[in-house]
Amino acid sequence: MFGRLMPREGKFFELFDQHADQIAIGSVELVGLMNQYADTNARQRHIEAIDAIEKAADRYTHETVALLHQTFITPFDRESIHQLITQMDDILDLIQDVAESAMLYDLQRITNEAQQLADINQMCCERVKAAVNLLSSMENANQILKICAEIDRLESDADRVMRSAMSRLFRDETDVRQLIKLKAIYELLEEVSDKCDDVANTIEGVVLENA
């Protein structure tokens, strides 16, 4: 009984950190997939790696939710904890969606814009990891808020690349099937950065409420 009343902040932050590690690793694999897409063996390795990373992250998500139900005193409000871990999980779900869609659609090529979006996503994910790693101490508040602002800027960069990519796609692509496939991949890639920005907004809210 008393165990349920004791704060277990450390375990929550440990799970956040472990999940954030998987996000960063997954984003590296996504860049590898986009850059080495023409190599069938490398492509398959990256897809399999992303699938394994997503499964590992799912375990951390489920463990966090279970801990939330078992713990009476939490490091910050329960709704924000659930929102944060769910949004973090969404990032890797989308990275996996990109990998699976590329395979399912049997894309003939990956464009420079898709590679640029993957690069931006990696930078976003690295900053998500950095912000999450600092979240256990509100002494890091200013640094966390700075990182969140960087994620917001990168998300705007992704929007600009997306607009340019779509413009060129509809202007230059003559194969309708290829156009539809690439459009879907672009949208998934952009959504990764959107989800990173959602995480940044949630973290920013936690910091402003608790600093």
Task: Show where each model-derived region lies.
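Cytosolic, long alpha-helical scaffolding segments
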Residues: 1-211
